[in-house]
Amino acid sequence: MENIKIKKLAEKYGIFAKKSLGQNFIFDLNLTDKIASHAKISNQDHLIEIGSGAGSLTFSILKQNPKSLTIIEKDHRCIALLKEMKQYFSNKINTKITIIEGDFLEIDLKEIFDKNYKIISNLPYNIGTKILFLLLEHYQKIDLMILMFQKEVCQRIVAENNSKKYGRIAVMVNFLCQTRYLFDIAASNFTPAPKVESGLVEIIPRERPIFDIDLKLLEKITEIAFNQRRKMLRSSLKPLTKDVNLWLEKAEIAGDLRAENLTLEDFARLVRGIG
């Protein structure tokens, strides 16, 4: 199979990218090898790939001989290709390969996360952040995530306060994880080429949140604050309390600041001070 281009294999099974599924395929194994290398895969690692598509990244992962790989793929057209790939590797590596046909957003993840995993995936553009927030609910069962998004989404994930990209996603992700932007991926690497650039991020879950607070309340506060990000906090946070000035005073945060000015510690003080 190494002599067969993944693109030819996809053609064999009539697989082409569907816009409705947010698909953009990579056929360059040099690139997917580079992506997989950032997961630092050992033969003791259990991996999950979400949305394998035409299988280039799957192939690169399997070449690293992990202990197991669970592939979750919604597109029925891709299943036969994955089964052929599984057969190809069956006498070459010791990896236990499990193929699950289904929508990741509808699967019972408690059954999936029976052990700790590394996650590596080229996420569908249209539901990438939704998948990320779902994964964060199981952060204690995840050792590492290497994820591909639109470049703008990557920038929002790793953004720091006082920047235009800083928002709810940066706060929620970085409360639970350490994040790092790895590299740009040009649109020309995809078939079809999307209208935007992509990027790769490394997300390493912490053993526990960086601050011990009510995360559901943090989610609510960040949603309200960043939905009106140009407003000062004394105005944007009014819907959450009867006395916003007293709340901000208890949290030791100036009312004329905006959500984008706050650090993670500031948000933690807001959560603790609302009571």
Q: What is each of the regions a protein language model found here?
A:
Residues P205, T222-G275:
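C-terminal lobe and adjacent flexible extensions of AdoMet/dcAdoMet transferase-like proteins
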Residues M1-I224, E265-R272:
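Catalytic cores of RNA-modifying enzymes
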